[in-house]
């Protein structure tokens, strides 16, 4: 018999994560690798686990993720967003918990573009009085 799966897509900066939740024992697989090996920073691993901790479903689902684009922080944020959306499909009662934790909101902050005449987005060239 076909196994029940819940899908969610998460985005952050230039990263896109396609997340599948499958009832299991709590493994997190990102791009075919265990997430302890994929994400090198403990703080970002905690970011990925936030939706599961908030809804108290940490050992209930295996999380299978395909993520591309961006760096570690963007990918971790995209995975968190995707897991939150998939959990919402699994059980709509999680909406209030996830919403209060701010996990359903797409983080719209992006890198500001560099402007001409400036060294960076806002940094001006050094000013000389004489």
From Swiss-Prot:
GO biological process: any one?
A: translation
> Highest taxon of the source?
Bacteria
Q: HAMAP family from the xrefs?
A: Ribosomal_uS9_B (MF_00532_B)
InterPro entries for the chain = Ribosomal_Su5_D2-typ_SF, Ribosomal_uS9, Ribosomal_uS9_bac/plastid, Ribosomal_uS9_CS, Ribsml_uS5_D2-typ_fold_subgr
Q: Which family does it belong to?
A: Belongs to the universal ribosomal protein uS9 family.
| Molecular function GO terms recorded | RNA binding; structural constituent of ribosome
Question: By what name is this protein known?
Answer: Small ribosomal subunit protein uS9
Alphabetical list of PROSITE patterns matching this protein: RIBOSOMAL_S9
Which UniProt keywords are present, listed alphabetically? Ribonucleoprotein, Ribosomal protein
The family database entries (Gene3D superfamilies) matched by this protein are listed as: 3.30.230.10
GO CC: one term? cytosolic small ribosomal subunit
């Amino acid at each position: 018999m076909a196994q029940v799966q819940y899908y969610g897509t998460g985005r952050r900066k230039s990263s896109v994560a396609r997340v599948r939740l499958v009832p299991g024992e709590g493994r997190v697989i990102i791009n075919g690798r265990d997430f302890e090996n994929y994400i090198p920073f403990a703080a970002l691993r905690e970011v990925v686990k936030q939706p599961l901790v908030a809804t108290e479903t940490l050992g209930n689902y295996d999380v299978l993720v395909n993520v591309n684009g961006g760096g570690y922080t963007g990918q971790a944020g995209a995975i968190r967003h995707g897991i939150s959306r998939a959990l919402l499909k699994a059980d709509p009662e999680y909406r209030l918990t996830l919403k209060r934790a701010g996990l359903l909101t797409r983080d719209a902050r992006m890198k500001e573009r560099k402007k001409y005449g400036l060294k960076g987005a806002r940094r001006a060239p050094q000013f000389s009085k004489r």
